[in-house]
A protein has these predicted regions:
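Conserved, structured core segments of small domains
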Residues: 1-97
Length: 97
């Protein structure tokens, strides 16, 4: 199942810079793992914000929640999830258009 996921990091202004650096490095590693596993399919940054939009794939909403919850920044994330359904005119879909 595919999901459109919006993530914004709400790091506190007075947060520890060393902890921020540690979490940033760990987040890159975990993000790469989720990408290699096919969970994160596509991702875009939002210019000027510490935010992104992505296409994620998981068996169901519970599996998606577990994947998002595995991100090191999870306690600081504002996440919005929109489940997606196939569209018959999707040009990337077999038989689409």
């Amino acid at each position: 199942m595919e999901f459109l996921v919006s993530i914004e990091v709400g790091w506190p202004a007075d947060g520890d810079p060393e902890e921020l650096a540690r979490l940033t490095a760990a987040e890159r590693v975990r993000g790469a793992e989720l990408g290699a596993a096919g969970t994160i399919r596509r991702m875009w940054r939002v210019p000027g914000r510490r935010a992104n939009w992505g296409i994620w794939e998981a068996e169901d909403a519970t599996a998606l929640h577990a994947a998002i919850g595995s991100l090191p920044f999870y306690p600081y994330l504002d996440v919005e999830v929109i489940p997606l359904a196939a569209h018959p005119n999707d040009p990337e879909r077999p038989g689409g258009r």
